[in-house]
């Protein structure tokens, strides 16, 4: 039996999603809690392995089990065993061929910037702080260069192990809500540090340090060394994952902006 689940977490106190020997990780906590409910070892596979300090509004994962439990029992039992900074939001029995990572049509990330002279005393690790005033219109102009299918070599970490630097960005929105500047981006997949590198570049543009056209120039250079500063993980959230309707999983309203021809990432599509 294959089970899908949605997970929310505050990544501040974790070394990332993926299990690491001797370190606190989300995967380890989730597997421990589910194994307790199953009364047997459980191994989970997630849609996107977030780095240290990165949060999730809705991470999606799946696991296989022979233990028969109701969806409610999985949900309540696992949450009872989880620490306060991790919560399972929903549990669904799904198709045997569902795969949290490989079945995804798109992933959505949200980057939140606290744009004011002083840092936050209440939520210091839930925003990235920028004291310089940010011009959202300039950031939008720069963001427009990144929408579509491109070689994102200038925006991926040098240690990125992906076979291809090509990704398709479906949308990249920037808006202001009071003291916060919010960037929302959806793509068929992301290279390592892609969202944080884009955020760092757009913050430089918004602060007036660079012109919006610089974003297009960086894209054309295909050189990470020219790509500016990687923004901190604090403001980054995995917002949600979109799957084909056949799996019956609810979609975040943000995915209404996806193009009709959006499909899952295939590394062999790019050459």
Curated annotation (Swiss-Prot):
Q: Which residues cross the membrane?
A: none
The protein's annotated catalytic reaction(s) are: uridine(38/39/40) in tRNA = pseudouridine(38/39/40) in tRNA
Q: Which InterPro entries match?
A: PsdUridine_synth_cat_dom_sf, PsdUridine_synth_TruA, PsdUridine_synth_TruA_a/b_dom, PsdUridine_synth_TruA_C, TruA/RsuA/RluB/E/F_N
Enumerate the GO terms in the molecular function aspect: RNA binding; tRNA pseudouridine(38-40) synthase activity
Q: Which domain of life is it from?
A: Bacteria
Q: Where is the active site?
A: 51 (nucleophile)
Q: What Enzyme Commission number(s) apply to this enzyme?
A: 5.4.99.12
What broad class of enzyme is this? isomerase
User: Keywords of this protein's UniProt record, alphabetized?
Assistant: Isomerase, tRNA processing
* Sequence positions that bind substrate: 109
SUPFAM superfamilies per the UniProt record, alphabetical: Pseudouridine synthase
What GO terms describe the biological role, i.e. biological process, of this protein?
Answer: tRNA pseudouridine synthesis
What binding partners and quaternary form does the record give? Homodimer.
Entry function: Formation of pseudouridine at positions 38, 39 and 40 in the anticodon stem and loop of transfer RNAs.
State the family it belongs to.
Belongs to the tRNA pseudouridine synthase TruA family.
* Name of the molecule in the record: tRNA pseudouridine synthase A
- Give the species this sequence originates from: Methylococcus capsulatus (strain ATCC 33009 / NCIMB 11132 / Bath)
């Amino acid at each position: 039996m294959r089970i899908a689940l949605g997970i929310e977490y505050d990544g501040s106190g974790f070394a990332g999603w993926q299990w690491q020997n001797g370190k606190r990780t989300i995967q380890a906590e989730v597997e421990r809690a589910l194994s307790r409910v199953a009364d047997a070892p459980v191994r989970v596979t997630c849609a996107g392995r977030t780095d240290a300090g990165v949060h999730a509004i809705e991470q999606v994962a799946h696991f296989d089990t022979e233990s028969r439990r109701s969806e409610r029992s999985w949900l309540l039992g696992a949450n009872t065993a989880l620490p306060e900074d991790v919560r399972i939001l929903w549990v669904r029995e799904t198709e045997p061929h569902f795969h949290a990572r490989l079945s995804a049509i798109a992933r959505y990330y949200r980057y939140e910037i606290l744009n004011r002279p002083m840092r936050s005393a209440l939520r210091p690790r839930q925003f990235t702080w920028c004291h310089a005033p940010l011009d959202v219109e300039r950031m939008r102009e720069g963001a427009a260069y990144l929408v579509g299918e491109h070689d994102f070599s200038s925006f991926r970490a040098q240690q990125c192990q992906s076979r291809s630097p090509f990704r398709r960005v479906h949308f990249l929105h920037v808006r202001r809500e009071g003291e916060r500047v919010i960037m929302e981006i959806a793509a068929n997949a992301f290279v390592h540090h892609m969202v944080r590198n884009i955020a760092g570049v757009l913050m430089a543009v918004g602060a007036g340090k660079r012109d919006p056209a610089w974003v297009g120039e960086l894209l054309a250079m295909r050189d990470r060394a020219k790509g500016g500063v990687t923004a901190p993980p604090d403001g980054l959230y995995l917002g949600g994952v979109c799957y084909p309707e056949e799996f019956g999983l609810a979609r975040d309203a943000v995915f209404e902006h996806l193009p009709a021809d959006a499909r899952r990432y295939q590394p062999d599509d790019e050459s």
